From Swiss-Prot:
It is found in: Cytoplasm. It comes from the Eukaryota. One of its GO terms (cellular component) is cytosol. This is Elongation factor 2. The keyword Phosphoprotein applies. SUPFAM superfamilies: EF-G C-terminal domain-like, P-loop containing nucleoside triphosphate hydrolases, Ribosomal protein S5 domain 2-like, Translation proteins.
Length: 845
């Protein structure tokens, strides 16, 4: 039943207007993979009978077992539209054949870095929302990410079969439930809207909302019904669609449409009367095996003739599933919606180039990307590495933005740390093969033009997680911007092999793990431990399983207890200016520390303010939003740690000699100090260090880096200690769904774990409550299992990293909670148990 060949797909790749790159995004368990199945079935990769049960895009064994998607998987679909379907289509197109590159992404929050990787290489998104659960926390996160990447969303309200079979909703109740979901989604879209995208809100009457039942493989948009009724009412499809949603009522006796309900029994809302009721009648007739009534209805709908003779013999649910699939096939409604309302690469790259390209927006590369020019220079972004079947090699998966990539072509690989004009993070290598991803298998093609997704073989030695590829001659090309992840790796474990001789395997395995997951961080501590950092418990569990089974060939490893990263900050200004002398006693540095204004550290994290900004723009933001003095805002020497972190060092000195010569040394000391704070050698966050005065030796030889760097670091530590230092701990935002009777259990578990509930909502029309709470990450281990035990498995938690919270107790006071934590961290790192006293860092005149 395969309906297309690889050559057909390859031919379509040249027609940019006929390509749609889209990802499927949603909250966990709202039915993305199941819905993707019916789309894949349309392209003839699996049989319709199995659609909904296969979850073809869940390619790993653990994904099939757990029933969750872990990695995002790409698949290319070929779809032929009829002239009838394209009647009013105004966009540009070449012929009726369309190529849809679809990426199914995970919904679970621990894997949201996979979603980011998927969004970067697509132009449109199908947002799936469960009609009963509504818009959840993860729906909001992925929508925000999509709009940030300038990706146009369309909405589908999924699992509507539950309205008919489980909940037995009245038509009016169902309409209100759907309307509420659409309103909630539109609020999010309006909040994070980007003016370059135009209006991103979705409306059923515009055809940008569909209603689907993924498991049963049927779906519809208002267009389907409007076409059916337009002839009967003697109007055109567009006017009919407006009548089928919103406050439009039809009275069957007077045969008139009104805007208000007349009060007569025969007067009903358009949506309820012409869409919900007919579906309900068909489903009920099929479920009750009332075949005479059912087949009469189907003959009126011109569906009866499409049913195969053996299908007419089915009973109950299988009959209902088959009838609905024949009448309202899911792929037609959804693919039609994507083709009509999602942009082609030629259209999307015009407005996406600003958020994609690092360099000047008028050079040859930006222009080629903007015009999606197949004859221009090659620009390709690799957003993730996919392990091949034998686990040893990786495919580099990404999207070609301009030019074309071919087998045997030499390319320049520019990693995330590449700076134009330097040799760092730069390789020139040959592509061995270009392949297309088809879910579980790969198909080789000769070359791929821009606007398409592709996987490359033979570059895995040179790309860690992501990279930009160009032609080998393009030496002035800039990279495509790095991805911003919405979660940060805050949970860490140390790993070691059980048998010491397996150490080389572990090191090699960690290298491969770092490639295969866009977010995980693998580092070696000074103590020689191997550390893996991930987004949460589940993320780490999957990473460790991959490491042991796939990347180390089953060699056994020991894993430490999970450890949480902390940050160090200050909550007051230094009570006096501290002074440190250099080892040769010829130079003195005076410094003080103060906390950043609220929201400034977050702004730096999000990249709104950074070291590469235009100083004028930066000082404007700092003075207007955070109340900085305009002069002071121009005197920021550096951000740190890693030159981009949420701390800064500023220069408030007046007329000091030789200051410029020691600037580099002070900045180097600041990077060192902000990476390892004074309390427990954790990163600092939200501290501004001010250089108040400097007294230097007149002779250059006596004020070299060896004298200044340790001195500056000591004075920063002293400044931190005098400004009321505090520990910051990471806090999760937890969303819990549970029925009313389980609420008591939820509250008691949260109280034991220092959690704090700040919102509780009952879902209208259901007995289910939605709780939102803050929970410290350090308390979250085993939280899920404790919660399920306390509520007999009725509560479902979702944790996502939210913010850093200062701990109330003073870490310098012996016996306080923070002090105990500091001692534990220092013991683990092999430092002296007591943090050093102020007198070690501060000198007297």
């Amino acid at each position: 039943m395969v309906k297309f060949t690889i050559d057909q797909i390859r031919g379509l790749m040249e027609y940019q207007n006929n390509i749609r790159n889209m990802s499927v995004i949603a909250h966990v368990d709202h039915g993305k993979s199941t819905l993707t199945d019916s789309l894949v079935a349309a392209a003839g990769i699996i049989a319709f009978e199995q659609a909904g049960d296969q979850r073809l895009t869940d390619t790993r064994a653990d994904e099939q077992e757990r029933g969750i998607t872990i990695k995002s998987t790409g698949i290319s679909l070929y779809y032929q539209m009829t002239d009838e379907q394209l009647k009013g289509f105004t966009g540009e197109r070449q012929g009726n054949d369309f190529l849809i590159n679809l990426i199914d992404s995970p919904g679970h929050v621990d894997f949201s870095s996979e979603v980011t990787a998927a969004l970067r290489i697509t132009d449109g998104a199908l947002v799936v929302v469960d009609c009963i659960e509504g818009v959840c926390v993860q729906t909001e996160t992925v929508l925000r990410q999509a709009l940030g990447e300038r990706i146009r969303p369309v909405l589908t309200i999924n699992k509507i079969d539950r309205c008919f079979l489980e909940l037995m909703l009245d038509p009016e109740e169902a309409y209100l439930a759907y309307r509420r979901v659409i309103e909630n989604a539109n609020v999010i879209m309006a909040t994070y809207a980007d003016e370059h995208l135009g209006d991103t809100q979705t409306h059923p009457e515009a055809g940008t909302v569909s209603f689907s039942a993924g498991l049963h493989g049927w779906a519809f948009t208002l267009t389907v019904f409007a076409n059916m009724y337009a002839a009967k009412f003697g109007t055109d499809t567009k006017r009919m669609m407006e009548k089928l949603w919103g406050d439009n009522f039809f009275d069957a006796t007077t045969r008139k449409w009104t805007k208000k309900h007349t009060g007569a029994d025969t007067c009903k809302r358009g949506f309820c009367q012409f869409i919900y009721e007919p579906i309900k009648t068909v489903i009920e007739a099929a479920m009750n095996d009332n075949k005479d009534k059912l087949f009469d209805l189907l003959k009126k709908l011109n569906v009866y003739s499409k049913l195969k003779p053996e299908d007419r013999e089915l009973m109950g649910k299988p009959l209902m599933k088959r009838v609905m699939q024949t009448w309202l096939p899911a792929h037609e409604a959804l693919l039609e919606m994507m083709i009509w309302h999602l942009p082609s690469p030629a259209k999307a790259q015009k407005y996406r180039v600003d958020v994609l390209y690092e360099g000047p927006l008028d050079d040859t590369y930006a222009t080629a990307v903007r015009n999606c020019d197949a004859d221009g220079p090659l620009m390709m972004y690799v957003s993730k590495m996919i392990p091949a079947a034998d686990k040893g090699r990786f495919y580099a998966f990404g999207r070609v933005f301009s030019g074309r990539i071919a087998t045997g072509r030499k390319v320049r690989i520019m990693g995330p740390n590449y700076v134009p004009g330097q040799k760092k993070d730069l390789y020139v290598k040959t592509v061995q093969r270009t392949v297309l991803c088809m879910g579980r298998r790969q198909e080789a093609v000769e070359d791929v033009p821009c606007g398409n997704t592709v996987a490359l073989v033979g570059l895995d030695q040179f790309i860690t997680k992501n990279a930009t590829l160009t032609d080998e001659k393009c030496e002035d090309a800039h990279t495509i911007k790095a991805m911003k992840f919405s979660v940060s790796p805050v949970v860490r474990v140390a790993v070691e092999p059980k048998v010491a001789s397996d150490l080389p395997k572990l090191v090699e395995g960690l290298k491969r793990l770092a490639k295969s997951d866009p977010m995980v961080q693998c580092t070696i501590e000074e103590t020689g431990e191997h550390i893996i950092a991930g987004a949460g418990e589940l993320h780490l569990e999957i990473c460790l399983k991959d490491l042991q089974d796939d990347f180390m060939g089953g060699a056994e490893i020991r894993v430490s207890e999970p450890v949480v990263s902390f940050r160090e900050t200050v909550i007051g200004t230094s009570d006096h200016v501290v002074m440190s002398k250099s080892p040769n006693k010829h130079n003195r540095l005076y410094m003080q520390a103060r906390p950043m204004e609220d929201g400034l550290a977050e702004a730096i994290d999000e990249g709104k303010i950074g070291p590469r900004d235009d100083p004028k723009v930066r000082s404007k933001i700092l003075s207007e939003e955070f109340g900085w003095d305009k002069e002071l805002a121009k005197k920021i020497l550096a951000f740190g740690p890693d030159t981009t972190g949420p701390n800064m060092v500023t220069d408030i000195t007046k007329g000091v000699q030789y200051l410029n010569e020691i600037k580099d040394s002070v900045v180097a000391a600041f990077q060192w100090a902000s990476k390892e704070g004074v309390l427990a050698e954790e990163n600092m966050r939200g501290i501004v260090f001010e250089v108040c005065d400097v007294v230097l030796h007149a002779d250059a030889i006596h004020r070299g880096g060896g004298q200044i760097i340790p001195t500056a670091r000591r004075s920063m530590y002293a400044a931190q200690l005098t400004a009321q230092p505090r520990l910051l701990e990471p806090v999760y935002l937890v969303e819990i769904q549970c029925p009313e009777q389980a609420m008591g259990g939820v509250y008691s578990v949260l109280n034991q774990k220092r959690g704090m509930v700040f919102e509780e909502l009952q879902r209208p029309g259901t007995p289910i409550f939605n709780l939102k709470a803050y929970l410290p990450v350090i308390e979250s281990f085993g939280f899920t299992s404790t919660l399920r035990a306390a509520t007999a498995g009725q509560a479902f938690p979702q944790c996502v990293f939210d913010h850093w919270e200062a701990m109330g107790s003073d870490p310098t006071q012996v016996g306080s909670q923070a002090n105990t934590l500091v001692m534990d961290i220092r013991k683990r790192k092999g430092l002296k148990p007591e943090p050093a006293a102020l007198s070690e860092y501060e000198d007297k005149l």
